[in-house]
Amino acid sequence: MLNLKFVRENPEIVKQNIRNKFQDRKLPLVDEVIELAEQARATQTEADELRANRNKLSKQIGALMAQGKKEEAEEVKAKVNADAERLKELEAKESELNARVKEIMMTIPNIIDPSVPIGKDDSENVEIEKFGEPVVPDYEIPYHTDIMEKFNGIDLEAAGKVAGNGFYYLMGDIARLHSAVISYARDFMIDRGFTYCIPPFMIRSNVVTGVMSFDEMDAMMYKIEGEDLYLIGTSEHSMIGKFIDTITPESELPKTLTSYSPCFRKEKGAHGIEERGVYRIHQFEKQEMIVVCKPEESKMWFDKLWQNTVDLFRSLDIPVRTLECCSGDLADLKVKSIDVEAWSPRQKKYFEVGSCSNLGDAQARRLKIRVQDENKKKYFAHTLNNTVVAPPRMLIAFLENNLQADGSVKIPKVLQPYMGGKTEIR
């Protein structure tokens, strides 16, 4: 969410940013919110004047009564009562105006970083760099579920009966591999100085609207019926929420957390949920990382975060590349985002396995996450998040890139301690 003062003083910058994100339908909202904010301010001024006048008249009533001027006191009382009625009207109007201002401000997108390429959707994202040499072996790479089924490692049919499309049972060495990857990712991030965290898997609505846009909320979140609770779509939501309504001394920043959690997503309107396999599903597990830092450090942390993901995948012998997300592919709260994609030898192309985002002060402003410097001055922090690893999507890349000619799957050295010393799955 932008600062209203910034919108009021820079309407053309805000409008151009909206155009850059190809959200022209939102252009009228800029002038509307400025006008509504002005009305709210004028209403507040009138209400403040009435309150001051009421206090003044109340003192007059006491003085008049003391002087025995009861009739005059009653006239002043009538004026006070009339002002009280008008004050109620003004307070209701001010509340209504402020609610509408907040509603609009929540829909106006954050100002994107100048380095973000302009484009309509993910087809216009820009490749930055490749890490590792993509290999296409001279033997066939089966579909990922076929590989898993060979090892009796997945049961989609039973999951479909129990929960419907978008769910799975993992078993045996495939389930063990899934857990091994999560455990390795956890230790990988702890070794890089992040504090390990297991967060709540449900959050309240004020946290949901603090970390994401209404459109994202509708497309992703499962609501608990009869409760003000939602299942998390990613642990970023509850980890960032940990700092709601806090003021952190500048000396205690940055806050760097890495967390494990199950994730639940409706994937409303998402292509692929009906397809066979585990690429796009309603429930999965993920290791995530977040940073809460000073504004001047967020760009530095952004580069560190996505590099962590690249380094982890390379340690597992999986080639990856990074893509700069274009303006139209950025969610409204994001300033800048980079996708990490893994190589698929079967498809002979890359596919998304993680995303790193800098949200500037958008989440902090919504959730009131503030910092206090040594002079007691308070300001909003910057927040960032990044996927460390998200099985089972990551398992697709792992199985394809480590499948051997005889149909066995090689286990990289770094994972072998988490697999009971196994060097391969057969």
Residue ranges and their predicted role:
Residues 1-134, 149, 153:
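N-terminal alpha-helical targeting/anchoring segments
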Residues 27, 130-426:
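TRNA-recognition modules of translation machinery and tRNA-sensing kinases, especially anticodon-binding
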